[in-house]
Amino acid sequence: MEPKRRKKGMRMKKKLIPAALAMIAFSLGLCSCSSAKTSGDGQVVTLESRSGRVEIDLVGARILSWRVAGKEIFFMPSNPQSPDGDWSHGGLSICWPWFGKKGSAASSIHGFARNKTFVLKSRRTSAAGSSVTLGLTLAAGEEPDFPYAASLELTFTLTDRLTATMRTLNTGKESFAFSEGFQPYFAVGSYKAVTLQGVKDADFAAVDGMDAAFPRRGDAFALTDASIGRKISATAKGNTSLIVWSPGSVEPHNRNLAPGDTERFIGLGPAFRAKEGAVALSPGQAHELVFEMAVGN
């Protein structure tokens, strides 16, 4: 009987070890998990690291929140969704398979991927943090405005920085062209105190009402907000432009933004616009757009 009791104890220890390891990982912020529903119909996927936390909506692969040391890095309006499928400001959104407007419908701006539900393809954790890959698959003829077979993968990795990778693969039998971009809404204390680096030849202040595309000058660029002592350092690869949007007081009412919201963020993100020549992919070819962000003082 005594050997049986020892075996039972060994089995209990084996069950306790994984649970203990899971608790350690959770306490260190090394695990990712799915959480409750959003205000829409999307499921939220959460990434955690020692320094921060990210929440991603599976609808549109949109980052709803990025917190570093307890502070929100992205601005999100009180009403996160625009009606009728229109573009919704806030967080970090994707523009695919076109950047800008195509057609006259409200839902035509920045492509249809932002309204699609992505599939959770994989999730990984490490001592440095965690990452998740979300996928969207299109069959030939599925979308009238983009009737090609393609797959889109979004990989988000959170360590001491946040990296977003957008990978487009031509899975069909004919070539196609597309454009894309990341649209972040960086929270600021005052848009009047923001300086941008690496966008033009020299540093410059954000201008009230600015909505402009600047040719890519290199991988690195930054946004410094003197009003809250924060600097966002970023790099981008696979883009032709950097898009700067500082609506300030010029556009007080814009889709899901309330009065005053336009003065609380700056948009600064990489894009590959059709105006500079869309990305052309032959069958089997892929293209990646990588956007890496780090928060400092």
Residues of each region from the PLM?
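Extended, loop-rich substrate-binding clefts of extracytoplasmic carbohydrate-active enzymes
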Residues: K37, S107-T159
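Active-site/ligand-binding surface loops and adjacent short beta/alpha elements
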Residues: K173-P247
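Bacterial N-terminal signal peptides
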Residues: A20-G29
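Short, Lys/Arg-enriched N-terminal segments with co-localized hydrophobic residues
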Residues: M1-R11
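Beta-strand-rich N-terminal accessory domains
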Residues: C33-G91, D219-T240, G248, Q285-N297
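Bacterial N-terminal signal peptides that target proteins for export
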Residues: M10-A20
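Asparagine-centered strand-capping/turn motif at beta-strand->loop junctions
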Residues: M166-G172
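Intrinsically disordered, low-complexity Pro/Gly/Ser/Thr-rich segments with frequent PxxP/GP/PP motifs
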Residues: E276-E288
